[in-house]
Amino acid sequence: MNNTFTTYLESQGKSKSTVIAYSSYALDFISYLDADHTTCPDFSGEVENATAKEVLSYLNHLQKKGQENKTRNIRLNVIKQFFNWQIEQGQRADNPIAHLKIRGTKQQKLYPILSKQELEEIYNTYEIPTDQHKKAKCNWFKTYKLSKQRNKAILSLMIHQGLTTPEVERITLNDLKLKQGLLYVAGSRKSNERTLELKSVQIMALMEYQYTTRKQLLHYNHPEEKRLFLAVPTVGKLAATGVENLQIWKGLTNEIKEQHPKFINFKQVRTSVITHWLKQYNLRQVQHMAGHRYVSSTERYLVNQTEDLQKDIDQFHPF
């Protein structure tokens, strides 16, 4: 018998961070019932007696606080699990919200999560051609090799730091602090700034890129260019025009797909990285690491850890 809601969640196979988050959501619901049950005057205030009416009142309360439907749906799912635990404990006879669902909630687009090993393999198997390559004597080979070296450095930051493609393009020389083992990621309209730790395995490769590869790439760019990742000229041109960086993602995506059929795109990589973070760190830490402006954005990734998040509900309350 699971004597506490926490042990009940653990028995369901939830990760440590999910258990902590879900337990706090349940406590928030209980606190609401204790403090604000006057909105339901016929309610005694005891959570064992809570019905769909009280749950709907709580969801209205969250809506007034500005929570999005997706976030409130996660909260609703937690209350469902809490009621199921109460049934197991003999504290209630049935689950009054078993088929309750918030209308208008769009299904979170879930990417198949790549394991840590699969993410590492994407990086490790991305090959940089050597001077013994059969095309090494072609006039385009030098820039081709440089682009591969640049791309491998980019993959390192996407797989370990979970950067978005626009964030990669915005990184400047001053943002990469190799001596301190840190990377500064500037904020934007959609994301917060943050400083992330570099892993020890990244330092030497990033140093090689910054002080060797980038210096060679600079020959094809403006000498005062401050971006960390530089473009190579398109075929037939002697210099980069400054827009080529915006065109690397489709080609790089196709390259990786050829070797890794499970790979879909770089949003999948970021989703996988954040999902793995949530198994290791708490919500607020992951919110900072991911650059999310609101914790509700981070909460959405909890869906990737919850296999039973209302996939099979056929009936719903017209909320």
Each language-model region and where it sits:
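Conserved catalytic core of the tyrosine transesterase superfamily
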Residues: 1-319
